[in-house]
Amino acid sequence: MPVMAPTASLLLSPRPLPASRRVPSLPALSASGRLRLRRARADTRLRVAAPPSVPGEADQAPGETEPSTSSADEKFVWRDHWYPVSLVEDLDPSVPTPFQLLNRDLVIWKDPKSGEWVALDDRCPHRLAPLSEGRIDETGCLQCSYHGWSFDGSGACTRIPQAAPEGPEAKAVRSPKACAIKFPTLVSQGLLFVWPDENGWEKATATKPPMLPKEFEDPAFSTVTIQRDLYYGYDTLMENVSDPSHIEFAHHKVTGRRDRARPLPFKMESSGAWGYSGSNSGNPRISATFVAPCYALNKIEIDTKLPIFGDQKWVIWICSFNIPMAPGKTRSIVCSARNFFQFSMPGKAWWQLVPRWYEHWTSNLVYDGDMIVLQGQEKIFLSASKESSADINQQYTKITFTPTQADRFVLAFRAWLRKFGNSQPDWFGNPSQEVLPSTVLSKREMLDRYEQHTLKCSSCKGAYNAFQTLQKVFMGATVAFCATAGIPADVQFRLLLAAAALVSAAVAYAFYTLQKNFVFVDYVHAEID
């Protein structure tokens, strides 16, 4: 079986979660590999960033809790959970970062005074300009770029440049109306989590987010993480990651092969408002768990025999967070681990035999393999929903034909969304009239790696900029060699300069060609033999 890259395709679980425990919600891992992960996990305390006025922290050791069975009339409260918004290593602490969560605009920034990541409502209380367009000022506060109002890590206003130094205007800076709305945040395992209810500090402090399995700390496992913003809905992505059977076809010659398709007799083991779990038997064995609202775990165990090493048990973990940003827009954060085909080395990221950005090339191929298929599927679902004036989840089994056990997890997710999730996330605002991206974006826009991933990935953005610089360096060298090739009287020296010009031109072109992997790669299934 091929090496599994972090993908929005396949997800599996450590073991079926017992039906007597309630699952919490906690962040995922940092991406450069197990070394950084172990450092991130060294501090096992989960600390919630201080609330707007009174500091609060949850000093609880991270761990799993088991789900409880749920009655059919129990409803899932979307806003009472931790949501990961980014891998911490892909956030730039020197600038504010915009993010959407449940259709609410947030600004993420790092308070240099406390060292904490802060999430505020992305609107200045003055005239509602987006704070994400601002900057971190000289005092370490977030400054609005429109009129210069500044806010500290608690959301309190610290400066109004237009206010008179005395009198009523001087008091405005201390007014509650001048404060920005702050949300609970938590960092663990290299992920930044946000609690989307500004009034939920007490509940957030008492709630733990779901953990990655212990194998992510094991030196015997090699790990990779990636995040990418996808222009289709949360339900479309969750259906996709709940479906192992599509791997062999949608990701042919990437992480699967068409000739390996076979029956997948999955069986459900537990379900409720918390999510569900299930598995199959045989080789490979796939275990899957969905922990609502957005955490999916898949574990693949493969018994194999190698000529030199003998019997081996290969284990692959693919843990996915599928974050509902807005209707028709979802962030996928995937953490994968494997105990075979390891290419990581002790030391820093630049020292790795296979750098993170190169791993992301394969991972993005997986995303691309799903992208246009899911765009078309979502369009058809939306059309069917409009024709019948009924929600897709209410009529899913009527408009689809799912006769095999391979679709068990897909049906389980759709059933969960219908029974407990009110058929869609609890969006802020009134998004029903918004045009969904999948209905209007072109193929080129849907497969835009630069906007969806490179700009949001520290590794790929750095490599892309480096490739551009190296391309220019070798182009300059080509010009220099060409300009001087005719000067020497020695023919051999002229030939040497001409050869150097050809080599540098070829290297410059190679760097130019490689840059497409950070920007756009067309994906045509029919052209893959």
UniProtKB/Swiss-Prot annotation:
InterPro entries: Cholesterol_7-desaturase, PaO, Rieske_2Fe-2S, Rieske_2Fe-2S_sf. Pfam families: PaO, Rieske. Gene3D superfamilies: Naphthalene 1,2-dioxygenase Alpha Subunit, Chain A, domain 1, Rieske [2Fe-2S] iron-sulphur domain. [2Fe-2S] cluster binds at C124, H126, C144, H147. SUPFAM superfamilies: Bet v1-like, ISP domain. It is found in: Plastid, Chloroplast. Expressed in leaves. Expressed at low levels in roots, stems, panicles and seeds. It comes from the Eukaryota. Residues 1-47 form a transit peptide. Binds 1 [2Fe-2S] cluster per subunit. Catalyzes the key reaction of chlorophyll catabolism, porphyrin macrocycle cleavage of pheophorbide a (pheide a) to a primary fluorescent catabolite (pFCC). Works in a two-step reaction with red chlorophyll catabolite reductase (RCCR). Creates the intermediate RCC through the opening of the porphyrin macrocycle by the introduction of one atom of molecular oxygen at the alpha-methine bridge. Seems to be specific for pheide a. Belongs to the chlorophyll catabolic enzymes (CCEs). May play a role in senescence and response to wounding. This is Pheophorbide a oxygenase, chloroplastic. The lineage of its organism: Eukaryota, Viridiplantae, Streptophyta, Embryophyta, Tracheophyta.
